[in-house]
Amino acid sequence: MDDHNLEEFRRHWQEELAQSQALRRRRRLEAGERRSPRRPEAGARGEPASGYLGLAQGLLEGAGRPPAPRPGRGGDRKDTSSRSRSPPDRDATEPEPLVDQLIRDLNELDDVPFFDVRLPYELAINIFQYLNRRELGLCAQVSKTWKVIAEDEVLWYRLCRQEGHLPHSRFSDYTCWKLILQECLAKEHTLRANWKNRKGAVSELEHVPDAVLCDVRSHDGVVIAGYTSGDVRVWDTRTWDYVAPFLESESEEEDPGMQPYVSFVRINSSLAVAAYEDGILNIWDLRTGRFPIFRFEHDARIQALALSQEKPIVATASAFDVVMLYPNEEGHWHVASEFEVQKLVDYLEIVPNTGRYPVAIATAGDLVYLLKADDSARTLHYVYGQPATCLDVSASQVAFGVKSLGWVYEGNKILVYSLEAERCLSKLGNALGDFTCVNIRDSPPNLMVSGNMDRRVRIHDLRSDKIALSLSAHQLGVSAVQMDDWKVVSGGEEGLVSVWDYRMNQKLWEVHSRHPVRYLSFNSHSLITANVPYEKVLRNSDLDNFACHRRHRGLIHAYEFAVDQLAFQSPLPVCRLPRDIMAGYSYDLALSFPHDSI
């Protein structure tokens, strides 16, 4: 019964479909006759492929446009032309669906011949070595072959060295240089955030109790300081448990308790140099011991001292003489060159990377001298009535500030000279106040920073001879300044140390101490500042106590912003006085500087 009903339903359904198709065909014929009454035979023929679908199928099959119908005389010709315009049999040539055609075209685009070029691996590495890390990442997404080349360890090792990370490492030290570069970039980002947020550790270096601070310098985290007691002390701020030694002098054994003041101190990676008020110069080798390896004596007070940061070369200025000292082939120190100048020297610097013969720059009043070890003193700049107020040198240029005096007042300027051509390249500034400090050695390329007594810090663009940025920094004038690729650190006469983000023209933070900031130096992760008093005389209300009060002796601060390198298990790095030293027995230091671990 069920099978009979199913067959009957199928028969009725097919009849309905046939009737509906016949009805639709009849309606189309009637509509065609009404539209074109002159050609009633066209609808009778019923061309099945006269629409756009037939045209599209013909194009896909490779055929051109169907030919236009030609008028014929008889019914035979009409039947022949109708059969010629009809589409081919579906069983003979099955047309490809549009979706399959699209997929086939996309598959043809996958294999680009440019990516399949077979190059030697070494040649591909030489081509890819000129790309930065962003471009290498884009190349790694092109194909599997390019990904292997873009992730080669040699490329990432070179890229890591080019960006200044791990400069002393070798290729065999690590196995994945791409990961090492990512870690270095993450640390750099953390360091920059710590600088901006003032997040890190601050250390006040141990003082000499019965002396006043005279001069401070540092090199790569190693700090040297000289005091009115004649003591010279060295700290290594890279380690918290380092005990700062005193550098002994030969005069201490001869006349104990009668030490002259320390006028200047300088330090590099291997040497420490100190100049005293009585004209004595001591040179220590930091790798051998605490006693000087060379002693030189001038007839008068030493007015300027310079030490090369790369080589063991020392230059001193006393009275009207400038002396250059460096060791010979056997290691014995001697006077290599001696120059005579017309006026007392105010500033003295040694030019870095000068080759075999050292070169120094000295300013004496309104004279600027170029001193070469194999030549006599030559005048680099001279304008009567315009004395030099500051000096700094780089490998190829020298910058110094001049004070404009006389009948024609042109404003105070900074002059930049080429050491090779010995001529003036730029005249910068034109300020009302005196330029007190300038830094071209540590500045980024084509930039220079200066400080002025008019309370402003200026960033100069050496390419356009214009002031790129001017910051109102310190109320009593700027005394020290340094910049890098994004920040400026300045110190003032009022004892304020300020950190600026000069790209945003914004002050990040500042710290204050009692005495003027005479020295500051920073690198990527640390900052050294020194507040040196004006007065070098001991003052204490208690005559029985010869210890100088803390507010008169000066301060040295060391800031460390790479907190991941700090050992917080050590005692609080605010003060490094051990328990057996009673330097502050006359006043309470226990609350401010605890010794116990926290």
Swiss-Prot record:
Positions where N-acetylmethionine occurs in the chain: 1
Alphabetical UniProt keywords: Acetylation, Cytoplasm, Golgi apparatus, Phosphoprotein, Repeat, Ubl conjugation pathway, WD repeat
Protein location: Cytoplasm, Perinuclear region; Golgi apparatus; Cytoplasm, Cytosol
Entry's Gene Ontology cellular component terms: 3M complex; Cul7-RING ubiquitin ligase complex; cytosol; Golgi apparatus; perinuclear region of cytoplasm; SCF ubiquitin ligase complex
Function: Substrate-recognition component of the Cul7-RING(FBXW8) ubiquitin ligase complex, which mediates the ubiquitination and subsequent proteasomal degradation of target proteins. The Cul7-RING(FBXW8) complex mediates ubiquitination and consequent degradation of GORASP1, acting as a component of the ubiquitin ligase pathway that regulates Golgi morphogenesis and dendrite patterning in brain. Mediates ubiquitination and degradation of IRS1 in a mTOR-dependent manner: the Cul7-RING(FBXW8) complex recognizes and binds IRS1 previously phosphorylated by S6 kinase (RPS6KB1 or RPS6KB2).
Subunit structure: Component of the Cul7-RING(FBXW8) complex consisting of CUL7, RBX1, SKP1 and FBXW8; within the complex interacts with CUL7 and SKP1. Interacts with GLMN isoform 1. Interacts with OBSL1, CUL1, CUL2, CCT6B, PFDN5, CCT2, CCT3, CCT6A, CCT7, VBP1, CCDC8, ARF1, TRIP13, PDCD5 and GORASP1. Interacts with MAP4K1/HPK1 (when autophosphorylated). Associated component of the 3M complex. Interacts with POUF51 (when phosphorylated on 'Ser-347').
Domain F-box: 113-159
Compositionally biased region (Low complexity): 51-65
Biological process, per Gene Ontology: cell population proliferation; Golgi organization; labyrinthine layer blood vessel development; negative regulation of insulin receptor signaling pathway; positive regulation of dendrite morphogenesis; positive regulation of proteasomal ubiquitin-dependent protein catabolic process; proteasome-mediated ubiquitin-dependent protein catabolic process; protein ubiquitination
Protein name (record): F-box/WD repeat-containing protein 8
Modifications after synthesis and translation: Phosphorylation at Ser-86 by mTORC2 promotes FBXW8 stabilization, allowing its translocation to the cytosol in response to insulin.
Phenotype of gene-disrupted mutants: Reduced embryo size and neonatal lethality. Embryos and placentas are smaller and only a third of the expected number of mice survived birth. Mice that survive remain smaller throughout postnatal development.
PANTHER family per the UniProt record, alphabetical: POC1 CENTRIOLAR PROTEIN HOMOLOG, WD REPEAT-CONTAINING PROTEIN 55
Modification type Phosphoserine: residues: 84, 86
Renumbered ranges of WD repeats: 201-250, 259-299, 300-340, 341-383, 384-429, 430-475, 476-513, 514-561
Main localisation: cytoplasm
GO molecular function, one term: ubiquitin-like ligase-substrate adaptor activity
Pathway: Protein modification; protein ubiquitination
Region named Disordered: 20-97
Annotated organism of origin: Mus musculus
Pfam families for the chain: F-box-like
Tissue: Widely expressed. Expressed at higher level in skeletal muscle, cartilage and lung.
Encoding gene, per UniProt annotation: Fbxw8
Listed Basic and acidic residues bias regions: 29-44, 73-93
InterPro entries in the record: F-box-like_dom_sf, F-box_dom, WD40/YVTN_repeat-like_dom_sf, WD40_repeat_dom_sf, WD40_rpt, WDR55_POC1
